[in-house]
Structure formats: C-alpha cells, structure tokens
Amino acid sequence: MTLYRADPKHGVAWVTGGSSGIGRSLARDLASQGYAVAVTALDDDPIDTLIVETAQMPGKVVAFPCDVTDEPRMARTVAAIEKELGPIVLAVFNAGNYISTPGEALTVKDFRRSFEVNYFGIVNGLVPVVDHMRVRARGHVVLMGSVTAYFGWPTTAAYGGTKAAINILAESLKYDFDKMNIRIQVINPGFVDTPLTEKNMLPMPGLMPVSRATRRMARAIKSGGFETAFPRRLSWPLKVLSLLPQPLCRAVISLTTSWKAAPLRYDRKPPSE
C-alpha cells in the first residue's frame, strides 16, 4: 500500500514553533505551495507579521497561539483548527528549545524543561491530531529531530536526549501508523543558523542559513521518506561514527570539539543543604 502524502487540496497544514527560525520559514514555504497553514507559537505578534508576508501567496497563514507544553490547550487548538480551517492533513511538529547542560552545572529544571517542550510538546499535539487522522484513514506527520540524536555530545545531555527520544518515537509509531495510512517522518538537520544555535557552545561545522535548510525540509516532506538527515557531509560521518565502539566515538568527539582540553566554566561550589 502506498502511504498517504499530504496535499493542500485535501486540507490544511499545522506548524508548531512557527513564529521564528525553521518553523516560520517552513510555514512560509507551505503557504507558497497553496496550503492554509495554521501556525502555533507562544506569541502571536510574530505570526501577525508572517500573515502579512504571505498575504499574496496561493495559500494563507492563520495564527493559533498556544504553549505546546499545555496538553489540554493543545487538544483544543487541534479542534479549533479543524473547525475553522478544515481537516489537518499535514502536521509539522517543530517547536523546540535548546538548553545547554554542562556536566558541572546540572539542574533538574533544565532537563524537565527540555523534555516538556521538545518531546512532550510533540506528544501533546500528536495525540489529538492523530485521533482525527485515524478516523479519516489518512494523514501526514513530521517530527523535527537533530543529528545530535545519534550519540552524546558535550553539553547536550538534555537537548540530545530529547532528539534521540523523538527518533525512537517516530520509529516505534511507524509500525502502527502505516496500518492507519498515516505517514510519519523524522527530519534530522545539522546546524542551522537560528536563535537556538546562537546558544550552542560547540563548533558547528556546515552551519547553514534557514532558507537553505527549509528548502531541504520541504523537499523531504514532498518525497515522503521516513528519515531525512542533512547536510550529508555532516550526517553521514556522524552516522558512521555512531557505529564505532563508544570509547573510540568519544575520543573522536573530544578531539574534534577540543573538549578534553576545555576548562570547566563554573565554580565548584558544594550543593546547597
């Protein structure tokens, strides 16, 4: 059976984290393809400017502000989109944050916040939207991962952990989604020049502009392949590296990031009693 592939003639697209960076650029691209695009973000002001930017395109952008960590409100947002715009045929879960987690300054708060936004921010929208897609026996879901999912990098214990979980989520759900004619994809980009990467303390080889990354993602969504990782000159070596014995993998990462020689950046204070 050929799995369903989203088409703007069949319904609307929904993009989370669409007020800036990759999400904003991708929403603009989808509107240019003729989609009515429901854009969800914390603040509707940036979405208002996006609406103006896309006013002359074949499709349109409509704001549905919501905090992706709010489970009940996300369910209501899905219902509102379905009622006001039509059936969601394409859901792109892009909302995310980046919190650096160096080993000498760990906090439970940082880990919890990372998973609340990056992982449960997907699940909170995925569950209600799939309920609608399942009834219609067709749908298309895209999850935003990262090449940091392949193995542990310095300072990415929280962020990389969420992206690894997203990849497992997609891999596991694909078995049953295939039976329901719901296509699921995971996109693992390398380093993209967005407000999130400005917080990254690691070297970022192959850093690419948002517009270029978005074009690659748009092609991936159209092609429908399960996993897309790019740029290849970065993703392929990382995949090979992930197959090596862990001590060797860590040695290569320490060398390429100069992390072994990097000093600790925080005072060594005893934990509060």
Identify the function of each model-found stretch.
Residues 33-50:
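Conserved glycine-rich Rossmann-like NAD(P)H-binding loop of the short-chain dehydrogenase/reductase
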Residues 186, 202-238:
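C-terminal helical subdomain
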Residues 65-76, 108:
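The beta1-alpha1 cofactor-binding region of Rossmann-like NAD(H)/NADP(H)-dependent oxidoreductases
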Residues 17-20:
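Conserved glycine-rich cofactor-binding loop
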Residues 146:
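Residue(s) in the substrate-gating loop at a strand-loop-helix junction
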Residues 102-103, 107-115:
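Substrate-binding pocket helix/loop in short-chain dehydrogenase/reductase
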Residues 126, 162:
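Active-site helix of classical SDR
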